[in-house]
Amino acid sequence: MKRLKLLPALALIAGLAVSIGTTSAYAQTTLRVFSGGANQRPDLMRKLFDQYQAANPGVKIEIETGGATSELQRQYLSTVLNAKDSAIDIYMIDIVNPAQYFGAGWLEPLNAYVGSPADAMKPYLPVYLQSNVVDGKVAAMPGFADAMFMYYRKDLLEKYKIAEPKTWDELAAASKKIQAGEGNPNLQGLSIQGAPIEGAVCTFLLPYWSQGKEFNDASGKLTLDKTAAVKGLNQWLSMVDAGVIKRNVAEVKTPDTVNEFKAGQVIFAINWGFAWDRFRMDKDSTVQGKVGVMPLPAMAGGKSATCVGGWQWAVSAFSKNKAEAAKLVKFMATPATSKFLAVEGSLLPTIQSVYTDADVVKSVPWFKDAANVVIAGMYTITMPVTTPAAMLIRPVSSISHQSE
């Protein structure tokens, strides 16, 4: 019943977004919000918007959804924003987009509404200061977090008395031991994404970052340590050759990893936070109660590193309702909203204190493990609009061909 108590609290916070004594708050304003696809839980966003509307009777909020993947959403948003379309006031955007979109002149600076970058971003994990502040301007506000996690078959590691691997080499050895013991030719050791999608960029960066290498210099310019990059790719290649990763990895997309792990065909799987509920709650999941979460292994002599993602709220530079839109964005970035999304939808908080909230811990126990991964994963990818994603994706997508 505690979940139901969150809504009145949110309604109170939503009401505080209206400035006392202003008449404009009671003039009918319609805000149109793009709130992503199914994985971004537009159903929960609708509940939050309803609370905001109840506390702000002069505001009506309409939702637009679309795009099953961040790539499809990015294609759509780029088309709309490039056309300077004012039909949508607020956008939910991926963590890699604020710098791109702000640099293109598509996003409204929020400093006048949320304060200085230091003040606005103080409650949030440091990665969101890095991704949402561009040239001293607040380009977007954090909505909810995401990160790549290492999911694993807890029952199989217990069966073979194997501890959580700390390095990729240890994971490969553990996989081979379990594969041999199970005698199932269809059992994969590790599932990663190698198809030409954003996940392949993270696949490339995980062993690269683990070696202590950065992808951006202090000015934001793309840099690449070729020796570390080759070493990381060779790590994946060796696991393909050993039969730990399947040979057609260049075809594997995010849903493929989820579905194969659910079907009991994978021992270790790298995927985003949303996958946890899929493994735990989907009716066709064969691994319910058998899944563990651990930090991603490191390269030998390196450190664990993960790809932190998440979704941000931004105001369109072409909106005709910027002030009202900014008020709604501010509400959607509050700790109370973050708590609601965590309890109701298992969406990872962008605010560290929410991870230890008693209601959150009770409702989503696995967050106690997730917190360490997200907090430690202070990395993100910042690329200008013109950077070809293929520059990063191609090396990963070619792994299976190199192993033939």
Model-derived features: where do they sit?
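Hinge/lid segment of periplasmic solute-binding proteins
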Residues: 95-147, 163, 172, 183, ...
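Glycine-centered hinge/linker elements that transmit conformational signals in sensory
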Residues: 174-179, 219-250, 296
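Extracytoplasmic "Venus flytrap"/periplasmic binding protein-like
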Residues: 50-127, 133, 155-166, 259-260, ...
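Short, polar/charged alpha-helical segment
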Residues: 39-60, 393
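C-terminal lobe and pocket-closing loops
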Residues: 273-288, 299-395
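Extracytoplasmic "Venus flytrap"
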Residues: 31-47, 66-70, 146, 198, ...
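Conserved C-terminal helix/tail region of periplasmic/extracytoplasmic solute-binding proteins
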Residues: 60, 158, 180, 241, ...
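Short, well-ordered beta-strand elements
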Residues: 28-38, 59-64, 89-90, 139, ...
